[in-house]
A protein has these predicted regions:
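Short, solvent-exposed loop/turn and secondary-structure capping segments
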Residues: 47-51, 89-90, 121-124
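Sec-dependent N-terminal signal peptides of Gram-positive bacterial secreted proteins and lipoproteins
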Residues: 2-25, 305-325
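Surface-exposed patches in mature extracellular/periplasmic domains of secreted proteins
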Residues: 71-81, 193, 238-240, 279-280
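Alpha-helical cap/lid subdomain in secreted, periplasmic
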Residues: 97-254, 258, 262-273
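Serine-esterase "nucleophile elbow" of acetyl-processing enzymes
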Residues: 26-82, 98-102, 262
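Structural motif
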Residues: 83-95
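Conserved catalytic region of serine esterases and O-acyltransferases that act on ester linkages
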Residues: 30, 196, 222, 228-243, ...
Length: 334
């Protein structure tokens, strides 16, 4: 009888530890982090000028918000690079194994591309029209040089407008298709992709003559390419072109300031679905934490539905111990 009781207690103890161990990490096992990957240029990176800390970019804000609303943790990876145009995007970023591995596990992919294609074309055109060997580092630098030359030769404006108007959109579309082919081949079928379209990066600059309208037309054509390919590749367009982002830019007149980044985050977030709980945001019991920042020490988080089993096993163990104690007392009196 005594051996049977001991075995019962031992068995109950093993079961208790097994269930308790499962309960302790149930939340972690059943709640995979949301994986967000950001690709693109300096806008997606959160550029804030040379030798200055980067802004809190829109991708980070979106990651935190959807994780919070879903009550999950998140893994956020940003592969954006300053000055990146679509050709370099394909050659220097998307061919990387690390990037492709990240895309294969991503739940949400955010992409901002295209502005540098336009700006690079503007710099190239300015260099050719001005017949200079100077390689402009920025569109702002090129614009200042153009403005200076136009003062003495107003006809230069028409040459620049003509050159920009004849830009080869086919090259941009070809590179964009290649990029989306790569991303589509890497991503999970259910992954969501949001692409920001292009806002006028020189709207706040005082362009000579009617050049600003030409730039607007070019941007419109580029955005139509992005829109045309959206159904084919299954991505959503976050419309920055018709937003107030250009009202929230840095001193360079191009890159968004923090308010601009926050506005982009709001527009992008509206295109992402499936991360809402059936409760108000204020009642969400999850905390958005980067996976790599989760403390190594595990905290016991027993799921409510497991408490009943744990209590029953505890009762069995306690009953077994009392039974043994009673038997010992009876044996002493004999």
């Amino acid at each position: 009888m005594r051996k049977t009781a001991v075995r019962a207690v031992a068995l109950a103890a093993v079961c208790f530890l097994s269930v308790f161990g499962t309960c302790s990490y149930a939340k972690e096992a059943t709640s995979e982090p949301i994986q967000i990957v950001v690709l693109g240029d300096s806008i997606a990176k959160g550029y804030c000028g040379a030798n200055k800390p980067e802004l809190y970019c829109y991708g980070q804000t979106v990651a935190e918000e959807i994780a919070q609303r879903a009550g999950k943790s998140y893994m956020y990876q940003n592969y954006a690079n300053n000055g990146l145009a679509t050709r370099e995007f394909n050659e220097k970023v998307l061919k990387g194994q690390e990037v492709q591995d990240s895309l294969s596990g991503a739940d949400v992919i955010l992409i901002t591309m295209g502005s540098n294609d336009l700006l690079n074309e503007f710099k190239k055109t300015a260099q050719e029209i001005l017949n200079t060997d100077t390689k402009f580092k920025s569109a702002d630098e090129a614009l200042k040089e153009v403005t200076e030359h136009v003062k003495s030769n107003p006809l230069l404006v028409f040459r620049i407008i003509d050159a920009l108007g004849n830009w080869d959109y086919q090259e941009f579309e070809t590179q964009w298709i290649e990029a989306m082919d790569t991303i589509s081949s890497c991503k999970k079928e259910e992954a969501q992709i949001v692409v920001t379209n292009i806002y006028n990066p020189v709207k706040q600059m005082e362009l000579p003559g009617t050049m600003n309208q030409v730039v607007e037309d070019i941007i419109g054509n580029m955005n139509r390419i992005l829109e045309k390919r959206s159904s084919e590749y299954g991505y959503q367009i976050a419309d920055l072109a018709n937003s107030q982002v250009t009202e929230h830019v840095q001193k360079d007149g191009l890159h968004p300031d923090q308010a601009g980044q926050d506005l982009i985050a709001e527009i992008v977030r509206a295109q992402i679905t499936g991360y809402e709980r059936n409760m108000p945001k204020s009642q969400v019991d999850g905390t958005a934490v980067k996976v790599e920042e989760i403390p190594e020490e595990k905290q016991s988080q027993i799921r409510p539905e497991k408490w009943g089993i744990c209590l029953i096993l505890a009762a069995v163990m306690l009953g077994g111990v009392r039974f043994l104690q009673k038997n010992r007392k009876e044996n002493r009196h004999k």
